[in-house]
Amino acid sequence: MASFFSDFGLMWYLEELNKKEFMKFKEFLKQEILQLRLKQISWTEVKKASREDLANLLLKHYEEKKAWDMTFKIFQKMNRKDLMERAGREIAGHSKLYQAHLKKKLTHDYARKFNIKVQDFSKQKFTQDDYDRFENFLISKVTAKKPHMVFLQGAAGIGKSLMLTKLMLAWSEGMVFQNKFSYIFYFCCQDVKKMKRASLAELISKEWPKTSAPIEDILSQPEKLLFVIDNLEVMECDMSERESELCDTCTEKQPVRILLSSLLRRKMLPKSSFLISATPETFEKMEGRVECTNVKIVTGFNESNIKMYFRSLFQDKTKTQEIFSLVKENQQLFTVCQVPVLCWMVATCLKKEIEKGRDLVSVCRRTTSLYTTHIFNLFIPQSAQYPSKESQAQLQSLCSLAAEGMWTDTFVFGEEALRRNGIMDSDIPTLLDVRILEKSKKSEKSYIFLHPSIQEVCAAIFYLLKSHMDHPSQDVKSIEALIFTFLKKVKVQWIFFGSFIFGLLHESEQKKLEAFFGHQLSQEIKRQLYQCLETISGNEELQEQVDGMKLFYCLFEMDDEAFLAQAMNCMEQINFVAKDYSDVIVAAHCLQHCSTLKKLSLSTQNVLSEGQEHSYTEKLLMCWHHMCSVLISSKDIYILQVKNTNLNETASLVLYSHLMYPSCTLKALVVNNVTFLCDNRLFFELIQNQCLQHLDLNLTFLSHGDVKLLCDVLSQEECNIEKLMVAACNLSPDDCKVFASVLISSKMLKHLNLSSNNLDKGISSLSKALCHPDCVLKNLVLVNCSLSEQCWDYLSEVLRRNKTLNHLDISSNDLKDEGLKVLCGALSLPDSVLKSLSVRYCLITTSGCQDLAEVLRKNQNLRNLQVSNNKIEDAGVKLLCDAIKHPNCHLENIGLEACALTGACCEDLASAFTHCKTLWGINLQENALDHSGLIVLFEALKQQQCTLHVLGLRITDFDKETQELLMAEEEKNPHLSILSSV
C-alpha cells in the first residue's frame, strides 16, 4: 500500500466523517489497537487530535499498510461502505495508470523492441481471433483450479517475444484479461541476468512509470497479477535449487536465479499467474520441477508461409517451385525456415547463389553449408571472387566474439567485448550493413547476432581457424571441452554449436574456409573429435550422459560415411528422443551404421502416431525401419527401452518384426508410457522370447484384458522373466487376482513392482498367493498403492509365512504407527526372513520407533531399513540407535533422510557407529544437523571399530565452515564416502 497515503491522503477520508462519526472512529481505533496488540498511542492525544493530527499519528506509529488496514476495518464497522468503495476505486487508479503507461511504451517501442526482419511479410492487425487466442492461453489443461503457469515453447527467433508483446498490448488496450489481471509485468531474462541480485519489488519498480511504485498496493491482490517472463533460456537455470534456498519475501534481494526459481516454483506469490517463453531445450530441462498448467507451442512459419515468402523474393513461379522443392528435400533446412529471420537468410542466400550462377544442390547439402555460404557471401562483394584483407579480419574477429559469447552465455555484446575481440568502432557500420550483427533492442550501444544460430556457426568457425589458447578470453575452452559440453547438453542454448564444428570438417566446407581465409587449415581437429568419441566409448557413465540426438546431428552434418561408421561403433549405449520428422531422419541415418550397441533407449513421442501427412508417411516408416534395424545389426544388444511414444499400427508391426527376429536376444525390455495402436496380443507374443528376463511396463496403460494376456505368458514354463515392473499402469484390485495366480505358478518371477496403482482391496488376493508354498518371489514393491488399515494384517501374515521374500517396500502408504506395530509383530519373530524393509513417507512418529527397535533387537536377518521422510525426531533415533547396538542386530544400511533430526541426536548416532560391527551406510540428508553435532559424528568415524563407509549428507546444505569440515574429514578417511544421493 506504499505511496497510497501520499497520493490520496488518509486525512481526506477522515474529513468525510461528520463530528459524531469521527468520535466513533476514535473509539473503534482504540479497540483495534488493543485487539491487534499494537504499540499504544496516547489516548489523550487521540481524543484531542484533529482529522489531520490523527492521520499523522497513525502514519507516525504504524506502517502505512497497517494504518490503512485498520482504517478499512473501522469504516466497515461504521457501515461507511461508500468510503471503502471509493478507496478501492482510487487504488485501482494505480492499475489504470500502469495500463496506460504500458500501452504507450509498447506502442512506442513496438517496431524497435520486437522487430522481426520479415516484418513486411508477417505484419498482421489484431483480430478477434487474436484476442480469443490470447484468452485461450490461460485455459488450464489441469482439472484442479490453480493459478496459471503457462509455457510458450518454441525455437529462438520463432516469434515468442512478438506474441507476448501483442498479448500485453491487447491487455493495455482493454481487450483481454480485464477482470482477471490488474497488472501484467514483463521481465526480459537478458535484463534480469545482468542485475545479478534483485528483489521482486525492484523488478516491478523498473517497469513502473514513476520513480516509486506502490509495491504494497500491487502485491495486495497476488491473484490479480500476471508475470510475463521472456527468454528463460538466457538464465541457464534448471530450477533444481533446494526448497531451503528459495525465498518468499518480495522485498528481499536474492541472486536473480533464486528469485526466478522462487516465483516459478511458487514459493513466492503462489497465487499469481505466469506466462513464460522458453526454448524446447529449457522446458525439457525444467519439466517436472515446475508445475505448468498449459504448454503452447509456437511453430513459426508453416509450409505455405515459407512458400509465400519465397514467391515474394523470386518472382518467377517455376524458379520459386524449383528452389522451394530443393529446400523441402532437406528436412533440417526446411525446419530452419520455420524461423522467420532464418527463412529470410535461406532465401536471400539462395538468391545470391543463383545470381552468381552457382549450383544450389551443394549449398543445400547440409545446414552447415547453407550457413557458411550465406556468411561468406556477406563479406565478398557481388562483383568480387575473394574477400579483402579487411573482410577476412572482420569475420575472424566476429568469430572470436561469437566463441566468447558461447562460453560466457552472452548474446548481447557491449562495445568493450567487441574491441577485446578485434572489432573496431569503424567495423560496426559494415557489420550492421551486411546484417550479421544488429543493434540490441535493449541498448543503442550493444549488439547481437542476427540470430543465435549465426553466432553458433561463427563460434564454430573460430575453432577451425585458431586454438582456444589464442583467444583473448580465458573463458573459451578447448575443442574437447566444447564437444563434451555440447553432447551432454550442459548448456541449453547450444543448439547447433557442436554439430557446426563437425559440419565444417566436410571436404567442401574446408575448401570454402581455405578459399575465404587464404590459407590451409589443420586436420588436427578431426583427430581430436574422434579421440573424444573414443573417450566416450571407454566410459559407461559418460555414455549415459551423452544425448544421442546431439551426437546424431554432429555426425549427420559431417556427412562422412567412413567417420560415421567409425564413430557409431564407438558406442555401446545410446539414449535419444526424436521429437520431429527431422530428428527421425537423422537418427535413422546414424543408427543403421551401428553394430556394437548393447543398450538402446529411444522415444519418438507422437512422430509415428496416426495423423501424419501422407507425403511423410512412407519416408517416416522407412526411417523407422532403419532405426529398428540396429536390433539385428548389433548382435550384443541386450536392453531396449522405448518410452513416451505412440506407435501407429504399421510402426508397431515394424518394431514387432525386428524384435521377433531369431538373432534378437534381448534380456531386458523396457516399455514406459507407450501406446501401441495395434492388436495387443502381438506385443505379448514378444515377451515369450526365452532370452527375456526383465520386463518393465511402468506408466503404460494396461486394461484388465492386457493383464490377463501378460499373466498367461508369465505362467508359461518357457517364460524366463524374473523381474516385472508394472508401476502406474492403471491396475485395479481385480487385477491382483490375476497376478496372484502367476505368483503361485511361476518358478522364475523373483521381483514384482506394483507401485502407484490403486490396489487396496486386491492385497488380500496377493497375500494369499504370497503365503502359498510354491511362491518364489523375493522382492515386492507396493509404493503408493492406497493401502488401507486392513492391508497390514494381510501383509503381516505374509511376513510370518513366506520364506523367500527378502525385500518389502510399502513407502508412501498411510501405514502410521498402528500399522507398523502390526508388521513389526511378524518381523520380530525369530524365523523372519525379510532382509530389507522400506517405509518412507508412511506417517511414522517417535512412537513407531519403539516397534522398529524391537525388530532390530530380535531379527538377525534384517540388513536394510529405510525410514526416511517420517517425523521420528531425535527421540525416535535414540530408540533405533540403542537397538542397533544390540548384538543381535546385523543392520548394514539405514535411511534417516528428512526425519526432523537435530544435532542433539548425534551422540546417539556416534555411539551406534562405534558399537555396531555391520553398519556400513547411513543417510542423514535434509535434517538440521549442526556443526558441533557433526564433529561428534566424525570423532566416532575415526574409531577403528567403526565400519561405516557411506554417509549421506548434501554438503551444500551447510554453511562454509561446516562444508570445509565435511570435505576435510572425507579426505582424511580413505574408507569414507560422503554422498549427496544414497
Curated annotation (Swiss-Prot):
Binding site for ATP: 154-161
Domain of life, source organism: Eukaryota
One Gene Ontology MF term: ATP binding
Span of domain Pyrin: 1-93
Residue ranges occupied by any NACHT domain in the UniProt entry: 148-471
SUPFAM superfamilies in UniProt: DEATH domain (SSF47986), P-loop containing nucleoside triphosphate hydrolases (SSF52540), RNI-like (SSF52047)
Single GO BP term: inflammatory response
Database matches in InterPro entries: DAPIN, DEATH-like_dom_sf, Leu-rich_rpt, LRR_dom_sf, NACHT_NTPase, NLRP_HD2, NLRP_innate_immun_reg, NOD1/2_WH
Protein keywords: ATP-binding, Inflammatory response, Leucine-rich repeat, Nucleotide-binding, Repeat
SMART domains linked to this entry: LRR_RI, PYRIN
Xref: Pfam families: LRR_6, NACHT, NLRC4_HD2, NOD2_WH, PYRIN
Gene3D superfamilies given in the database record: Death Domain, Fas, P-loop containing nucleotide triphosphate hydrolases, Ribonuclease Inhibitor
PROSITE patterns, alphabetized: DAPIN, LRR, NACHT
Ranges occupied by LRR repeats: 594-617, 689-716, 746-773, 802-825, 827-844, 859-882, 916-940
Family, as annotated: Belongs to the NLRP family.
Task performed by this protein: May be involved in inflammation and recognition of cytosolic pathogen-associated molecular patterns (PAMPs) not intercepted by membrane-bound receptors.
Protein name, entry field: NACHT, LRR and PYD domains-containing protein 4C
Organism encoding this protein: Mus musculus
Lineage summary: Eukaryota, Metazoa, Chordata, Craniata, Vertebrata
